From Swiss-Prot:
Domain Radical SAM core: 38-256
Name listed for the protein in its UniProt record: Biotin synthase
Organism the protein comes from: Salmonella typhimurium (strain LT2 / SGSC1412 / ATCC 700720)
Catalytic reaction equation(s): (4R,5S)-dethiobiotin + (sulfur carrier)-SH + 2 reduced [2Fe-2S]-[ferredoxin] + 2 S-adenosyl-L-methionine = (sulfur carrier)-H + biotin + 2 5'-deoxyadenosine + 2 L-methionine + 2 oxidized [2Fe-2S]-[ferredoxin]
Co-factor(s): [4Fe-4S] cluster; [2Fe-2S] cluster
Length: 346
């Protein structure tokens, strides 16, 4: 198998320095070579264990080190998670993502996690989890249970990383991604814009992701959501064009990956989001809440989809059954139905 070309920091920096419209044109051309530009992947995200995380990530309201007013919750029961997954599927979601605020899962938690994955998979949904660091055995057990994707973000460049997190190393994050890949699970990994990093740091983050032995299949690009009580609560706002530029560079560097417009969409107007889609973003989380931070209300997403002529990505299911796709299309048109899914209500 031919190895994908490796990027250099100077090459990535040159992309960031291109005139914005020229950069967007290049990104859109590359995007159209690999994806239908009118199709957007729609996923649902559920926090299955909230708060009391021992890590010191300065952006995160779930850290036990910061007083953010977030109440910690224990790991949800298996049937609770499966009930949420059923509602997500009824609303038309094709991927169900589950997050737990852990440094790493304990061995006692693994049987529950395996049952959750098996149960969600049995519904015909793609599965994704983010649970912190994994060892080889844990990664393999999740793979054997049927986990499709594992999310573990690099957050920022190796050089800036120590300013944001001290309780786990950058190499530990890379090691987890390697274990996930070796277990046969697809990788979801990205970062955050607005931590106080420089453009060179943004280039460094994308360089790390694109130069992995196999680039992530899914690349979430988050805009910092500033939460009172966290050390980054008073950070400067991110310029919209700088964020759009980051999306475009990610698309150019990782042409076959899904680039997810992730946290921070609540802070973006429709024009900014539209330019992100033009820059190559082709995946979003659908629902009012992303773990513990706000996400645009569903009706706003539906209105924006209509204005831009975007559609939920077509679902590949067995025997030509397109019921799941039809459900999502109906939901996008009729947000007042019983199946209309509100992630924040779970």
């Amino acid at each position: 198998m031919a190895r994908h070309p490796r990027w250099t920091l100077s090459q990535v920096t040159e992309l960031f320095e291109k005139p914005l419209l020229e950069l967007l044109f290049e990104a859109q051309q590359i995007h159209r070579q690999h994806f239908d530009p009118q199709q957007v992947q729609v996923s649902t995200l559920l926090s299955i264990k909230t708060g009391a995380c021992p890590e010191d990530c300065k952006y995160c309201p779930q850290s036990s080190r910061y007083k953010t007013g977030l109440e910690a919750e224990r790991l949800m029961e298996v049937e609770q998670v499966l009930d949420s997954a059923r509602k997500a599927k009824n609303a038309g979601s094709t991927r169900f993502c589950m997050g737990a605020a852990w440094r790493n899962p304990h061995e006692r938690d693994m049987p529950y996690l395996e049952k959750i994955v098996q149960g969600v998979k049995a519904m015909g949904l793609e599965t994704c989890m983010t649970l912190g660091m994994l060892n080889e055995s844990q990664a393999q057990r999740l793979a054997n249970a049927g986990l499709d994707y594992y999310n573990h973000n690099l957050d920022t460049s190796p050089e800036f990383y120590g300013n944001i997190i001290t309780t786990r190393t950058y190499q530990e994050r890379l090691d987890t991604l390697e274990k996930v890949r070796e277990a046969g699970i697809k990788v979801c990994s990205g970062g955050i814009v607005g931590l106080g990093e420089t453009v060179t740091d943004r280039a460094g983050l994308l360089l790390q992701l694109a130069n992995l032995p196999t680039p992530p299949e899914s690349v979430p690009i988050n805009m910092l959501v500033k939460v009172k009580g966290t050390p980054l609560a008073d950070n400067d706002d991110v310029d919209a064009f700088d964020f759009i530029r980051t999306i475009a560079v990610a698309r150019i560097m990782m042409p076959t990956s899904y680039v997810r417009l992730s946290a921070g969409r609540e802070q973006m107007n429709e024009q900014t989001q539209a330019m992100c889609f033009m820059a190559g973003a082709n995946s979003i989380f659908y629902g009012c809440k992303l773990l513990t931070t706000p996400n645009p209300a569903e009706d706003k997403d539906l209105q924006l989809f209509r204005k831009l002529g975007l559609n939920p990505q077509q679902t590949r299911v067995l025997a030509g059954d397109n019921e799941q796709q039809q459900r999502l299309e109906q939901t996008l048109m009729t947000p007042d139905t019983d199946d209309y899914y509100n992630a924040a209500a779970l």
